[in-house]
Amino acid sequence: MSSRHDKEKGVNVQVLLRCRPFSDDELRSNAPQVLTCNDLQREVAVSQNIAGKHIDRVFTFDKVFGPSAQQKDLYDQAVVPIVNEVLEGFNCTIFAYGQTGTGKTYTMEGECRRSKSAPCGGLPAEAGVIPRAVKQIFDTLEGQQAEYSVKVTFLELYNEEITDLLAPEDLSRVAAEEKQKKPLPLMEDGKGGVLVRGLEEEIVTSANEIFTLLERGSSKRRTAETFLNKQSSRSHSLFSITIHIKEATPEGEELIKCGKLNLVDLAGSENISRSGARDGRAREAGEINKSLLTLGRVISALVEHLGHVPYRDSKLTRLLRDSLGGRTKTCIIATVSPAVHCLEETLSTLDYAHRAKNIRNKPEVNQKMMKSTLIKDLYGEIERLKAEVYASREKNGVYMPKERYYQEESERKVMAEQIEQMGGQIENYQKQLEELQDKYVGQVRECSDLTTKLDITEKNLSQTCKVLASTNEELKKSQYAMKEKDFIISEQKKSENVLVQQACILQSNLEKATKDNSSLHQKIGREDKLSADNRKVVDNYQVELSEQISNLFNRVASCLSQQNVHLQGVNKLSQSRLEAHNKAILEMKKKVKASRDLYSSHLEAVQNVVRLHKANANACLEEVSALTTSSACSIDEFLASGDETTSSLFDELQSALSSHQGEMALFARELRQRFHTTMEQTQEMSEYTSTFFQKLMEESKNAETRAAEANDSQINSIIDFQKTYEAQSKSDTDKLIADLTNLVSSHIRRQHELVDSRLHNFKDAVSSNKTFLDEHVSAVNNLTKDAKRKWETFSMQAENEAREGADFSAAKHCRMELLLQQSVGHAESAFKHCKITHESLKEMTSKQVTDVSSLVRSACDSNEQHDAEVDSARTAAEKDVTKNSDDIIQQIERMSEDEKASVSKILENVRSHEKTLESFQQDQCCQARCIEDKAQETFQQQYMEYEPTGATPTKNEPEIPTKATIESLRAMPIETLVEEFRENNSYESFATKETKPQQLTRSPLSQVN
């Protein structure tokens, strides 16, 4: 919950990135650059080659400073706001983080010695963050004119041991050794922070004192030379500045505002294999990397909001505890190298710095202290200092620290030099003052002379002004008079321009009227010529149309006569074919009747044979029954056991014979039914043929009637058309002679309408005749096709009936043979049974077996005889049926061939008639098309209508000016124009406007006349 609260209300750690330029060694070795900085977009791009692939990683920070960035740029953009917040009462921390040799110490300290070339001891351009922050603090405090006090501490963390870099140097060797053996302890302050017991706090009053302390402490800091850095820091340093500022509340109470600035220069992480560290240097590098690794773990824990943050794993992280996740505003300056051999350390630094951006601190303003509390603390400090002074002054003379003595001597020398410089400046100022006094006296004399000349010039000016006023008055009068003349001339010019415009309009109207008259005469001539040409075209068309109509009438008459002849031929052919068909039907009836009688006789013979066979079988059965009865007494006991078997065999034989008789009767009945069906179909075919020829005769008669009617209607329409055309032409000719110009268009329209209507009626009549003939021909074709289809169907049915009869006879013959075989089989089974009985009763029934065997043989002989008779009857019946069927089929085929021949003749006749009609239709269409083309050529091409040429003038009403308009064109009198000008432009108003002589818009007298 607390981490989420800090995240909501906290402030992110500010992370800056600075890239150093290439060193001399790197430039000599042409080391590739793998890091590029974009200051504007605050991005850093690192190029990598992983598995042969070029990969760029981009990191974003709060601010980015490239190799060309100066110390002042970094300080002004990043550190100035932090120092201002320290002066507002916040605790702030700035520390540099990065690999060894990337410029951390240079960024934090730089060149902190005072520049001798600058006045008043200014800072050099290479000064780092610490000296610039010190200077800003004292400049701000001096500018505020507030009461303040500043304390500084400077400690070093070397191999996890804290050393005071500001400790006095005059300690005895024993004391120094004891102090080295017992490093300064690090203790908790009870408020979440830490403090170092025994750490010296130096009170300073100026920036120079801080610079001196900074130089003294930096000289004590442990450094060593490695392969990567000639002056590598082997320890972490922490420079703290504590500021107390006095403030007064509106109630008059005095409070002390406290702010603290921690400036940390971390030792750089290094790779021992590349830095060349050995023995003690290797141990130093291990401790440095260990503390920096702990710092990275702390950053990761804070970013991931873990429950445990390992602050206590290193004294460095304990010192920076309040700066990382505490109540301090923190700024991290990450320094990197652009060279490729430092790529691994550069990526590590960028990763940790980028993660540190997500750390959120919760800065708070330090609580202001009461003045009494601070005075109480100061009293204790004063008592401690008094004890030290008393102990120091037990000797003779005045005791002063060496640093203070050297400082006062240097200040005295500086002040003496400044006094000498100021004395020389005073002498120079006196000389300049004397020169200025001499110049002032000369200036006064020149001023008096100029005053005299000014008086004379003013007198001349007053006289000149009077002359100028009179001249201006005369000039105004002259200009006013010229304005009057210009106004009169302009009005007269306007009248003149209007008259000229009116004259030009009249001239153009006159020329246009002349051209219109000539155009009208030309149009009348063109219309007369066109009327004469059209009259000739109409006369020629009348003669040609009469000739074409007479030719058309003759062709229609000849076509009608050909149609009558053709219809008579079709009628004769149909009658002859009808008579032949009736004869064939009579012959067919006779043959069918004879076949029926023959079938009846054969059926009676078969029935007689069946009856005889039945009687013989019954006699045999009776004899067998009697014989069996006579021997029943002797073999009762034995027959009792086989009675059922014997009776069943004879029952089966009896049933087989009965079924044989039934099959024969059914065969005869079905044969009669089939012949009866054949007769009915033959009668239906005969009736249909008669009906067909009757319909054909009716259609022929209808065609003759319709052709005659069409011929009469065509002749009448042609006669009516000729009469109407002659009357219309005569009346139109009379009217054209009377008024040709006005009635040409109406004559042409009536001629067109008359010809079009008559041609349309003629075409309708021709098309209706063609339609009727086509319908008639199609009806005849349909009847013929229907008759042919019926006859083919009848032939196929008759052929199928005959084939089915033959198949039926063959099937019945097979059935009869099967029944006979079954009878023989039953007899053989009975014979076998009797044989078994005879063998079993051989001794008792030898005589009876002999009798039964003779009876069976006689029955078999009778059966064989019966089969022979049935076969002979069947053979005779098959021969007769086959002969009659062949005769009927031949007769039907002959009738079909005759019918096909007659139908083909009729079809040929119809086709020739169709061709005749088509040729007649084509001739009529060609003739009508010729008449239509001639009419179109006459009335659309030769008969020319008048076409506008565009030269005929349109009707225009000329604009005739009235007398009042002509009178208004006169120019006004000059006196009237002068009065009008003076009314609109008075002399007084003109005089007020023309205060100066104006340049005229025209040269004098250039356009007056």
Swiss-Prot record:
Residues that bind ATP: 98-105
Domain Kinesin motor: 12-359
MF terms in GO: ATP binding; microtubule binding; microtubule motor activity
Pfam families: Kinesin
Domain of life of the native organism: Eukaryota
Xref: PROSITE patterns: KINESIN_MOTOR_1, KINESIN_MOTOR_2
Comp. bias regions, Basic and acidic residues: 863-882, 987-996
InterPro entries from the UniProt entry: KIF11-like, KIF11-like_kin_motor_dom, Kinesin_motor_CS, Kinesin_motor_dom, Kinesin_motor_dom_sf, P-loop_NTPase
Biological processes per GO annotation: microtubule-based movement; spindle organization
Main location per the UniProt record: cytoplasm
Location in the cell: Cytoplasm, Cytoskeleton; Cytoplasm, Cytoskeleton, Spindle
UniProt-listed CDD domains: KISc_BimC_Eg5 (cd01364)
Polar residues bias locations: 997-1009
Coiled coil: 406-526
Chain positions covered by the region annotation Disordered: 862-882, 987-1009
Keywords recorded for this protein, A-Z: ATP-binding, Coiled coil, Cytoplasm, Cytoskeleton, Microtubule, Motor protein, Nucleotide-binding
The protein's role, per its UniProt record: Responsible for microtubule translocation. May be important for the organization of phragmoplast-specific arrays of microtubules. Plays an essential role in stabilizing the mitotic spindle. Required during mitotic cytokinesis.
Family: Belongs to the TRAFAC class myosin-kinesin ATPase superfamily. Kinesin family. KIN-5/BimC subfamily.
Protein name: Kinesin-like protein KIN-5C
Organism for this UniProt entry: Arabidopsis thaliana (Mouse-ear cress)
High-level lineage: Eukaryota, Viridiplantae, Streptophyta, Embryophyta, Tracheophyta
Gene, per the UniProt record: KIN5C
